[in-house]
Structure formats: structure tokens, C-alpha cells
A protein has these predicted regions:
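Short regulatory "switch" loops immediately downstream of catalytic or recognition motifs
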Residues: 21-31, 84-90, 154
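Glycine-rich phosphate-binding loop and adjacent beta-alpha segment
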Residues: 85-96, 131-179
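Glycine- and charged-residue-rich phosphate/anionic-cofactor binding loop of Rossmann-like
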Residues: 6, 125, 175-179
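Structural motif
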Residues: 36, 63, 118-119, 142, ...
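Adenosine-nucleotide cofactor-binding segment
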Residues: 41-42, 47-50, 58, 62-137
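Residue-level preference for short coil/turn positions at secondary-structure junctions
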Residues: 4, 40-41, 67, 123, ...
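Residues forming the Rossmann-fold NAD(P)(H) cofactor-binding site
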Residues: 55
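NAD(P)H dinucleotide-binding glycine-rich loop of Rossmann-like/cofactor-binding domains
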Residues: 1-43
Length: 179
């Protein structure tokens, strides 16, 4: 009851988003030290990222002190993508040093190829998945770059949900997962 309840209801989801950004980690070649957080000035993708939590992640990615230089946000709903682009414009992101793109992956013959093209084929440093959909998680795995960190943010309700990942890349490309 009252303002405190309302403010608390807004703070909890954002604290989850902030925690997610800080849970991401990266490693250095020949070192076992984990550098916590997203890659500053790196390449980030937010998949299925225009729902309420995804919008919070876009906001945080653009306005946080540690932000990517490239942010690609995907979804399969044009109306939601349009709304996200109105709330967080590429121009606003550019003022903060972030090149922002919104992409409808449903309209693409090969979403992985198209998304990796934003990185000149190198893949993304940080990828967040905001929907508990196995093919989406697998897509995220395929767009990771060297030392890429994949965060499965979406809490699945199905305890049997599983997806394939490239184990070779876990070992040789230093891919890692957090959730």
C-alpha cells in the first residue's frame, strides 16, 4: 500500500537486470581470472529483447557506465520492435556511444548469418536471451564470438527445457553460460 510498494515493485525487476549485467564475465588468454561484467565497448545482442525486462536491459545497456559499442536487439513482433525503437532510439543510443539496431529475426532466412554480419562475422561478446525458447538459446550460442558470454535470463517454467550448445566452442572458443 502507498508509494513505497509501487517503487519497490519497479526496483526488483531492474535489480535483476543490473545483476545480470554484472554476472556476465570474460577471461583473458592464459589466465584464470574472470573479468566481471559485459565487455566495455564490446558487441552485445539481446534476443527476444523487447518485452518489459528486455526494455529494461536496453535502457541499462545504453545508460550504464560500462556499455557496449554495438547493441543488436531482436524479436519476432514488429509492433513490439517499433515501440522499443520509439522508447530507445538509435539516435539516443548514439549519443551514449552505442550503435543500436533492432532486428525482426522472423523475417530472416538465416538469422545467425545476419546477426553475425553486424560483427563482421566475429560474433558477439555478450548475448542475453529473454525468452525460454530452445531454438532461441541455440541461436544465441551460434552468434557468440571468442570468449563470448551467454546469459539465459528467461526463467523457464518447464523443468525439462533443454537445448543444444556447441561444446567444441565451450572449450576452444572459451564460450561460457550464466543464468
Amino acid at each position: 500500500e502507498g508509494d513505497a510498494f509501487y517503487m519497490g515493485s519497479l526496483a526488483e525487476p531492474m535489480s535483476c537486470i543490473v545483476g545480470t549485467f554484472h554476472a556476465m564475465y570474460h577471461t583473458r588468454k592464459d589466465s584464470y581470472v574472470h573479468d566481471m561484467g559485459i565487455v566495455e565497448g564490446g558487441k552485445m545482442a539481446i534476443l527476444a529483447g523487447v518485452g518489459p525486462m528486455g526494455l529494461g536491459a536496453i535502457d541499462y545497456a545504453i545508460h550504464n557506465e560500462r556499455r557496449p559499442s554495438l547493441l543488436v536487439v531482436t524479436d519476432i513482433d514488429n509492433a513490439r520492435l517499433k515501440r522499443a525503437a520509439e522508447l530507445f532510439t538509435p539516435e539516443e543510443a548514439a549519443r551514449h556511444g552505442v550503435e543500436l539496431h533492432y532486428v525482426n529475426t522472423k523475417e530472416l532466412a538465416d538469422p545467425v548469418e545476419r546477426l553475425k554480419a553486424y560483427t563482421n562475422g566475429d560474433g558477439f561478446d555478450d548475448v542475453m536471451v529473454f525468452a525460454p525458447v530452445a531454438p532461441l538459446f541455440e541461436q544465441a550460442d551460434r552468434i557468440l564470438g571468442q570468449d563470448g558470454c551467454l546469459n539465459f535470463f528467461a526463467g523457464p517454467t518447464n523443468p525439462e527445457l533443454s537445448a543444444n550448445i556447441n561444446i567444441y566452442d565451450v572449450h576452444y572458443a572459451s564460450h561460457h553460460l550464466v543464468g
